[in-house]
Regions:
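Bacterial Sec-dependent N-terminal signal peptides
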Residues: 1-9, 13-40
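First exposed extracellular module after export/assembly in secreted or surface-exposed proteins
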Residues: 30-147
Length: 147
């Protein structure tokens, strides 16, 4: 009986500890998201932030969608994807978010197109152009696939 009470107390203590820590992380995460939006989308406001596991899905007032990876302990929040396809204001992903190598490739071979979506992960990058073409790059910016 005594063991059960101790185990229950430890479990409740752990649950309270993790709940309080996640609230702090959420407040810090929201500050990071707001700073990102102020930097790259200065005329927009965050209208929704949805936590999906460790990720945060953010919708801006112009319907731009941004996904952040919240699974990076002790590091700054990183964006995984920026999607301006449904934006009422931005017709392309802000240039400051696009690596130079990718921007150069698009300007050389797809000069009439804009990058409307960009995503990154440990394997590389993926972009979608305004004409619907999707291009995948590896981590060294070599083309892996064009769809």
């Amino acid at each position: 009986m005594k063991k059960s009470i101790i185990i229950a107390a430890l479990f409740i203590g752990f649950a309270l500890y993790t709940t309080s820590c996640s609230k702090e992380a959420t407040a810090q995460t929201q500050i990071s998201i707001n700073n990102f939006v102020a930097t790259y989308f200065p005329n927009e406001e965050v209208i929704a932030t949805i936590r999906d596991g460790f990720d945060y899905d953010v919708t801006l007032s112009d319907y731009t969608q941004i996904e952040f990876d919240g699974n990076i302990v002790g590091k700054k929040l990183e964006w995984d994807e920026v999607n301006c396809k449904h934006s009422t204001v931005y017709t392309a992903v802000p240039a400051a978010l696009i690596p130079t190598e990718i921007a150069d490739h698009v300007s050389r071979l797809h000069s009439e197109q804009r990058i409307v979506k960009i995503a990154k992960d440990f394997r590389g990058w993926e972009i979608e152009l305004s004409n619907g073409i999707e291009i995948e790059f590896d981590s060294k910016f070599r083309i892996r696939e064009i769809d």
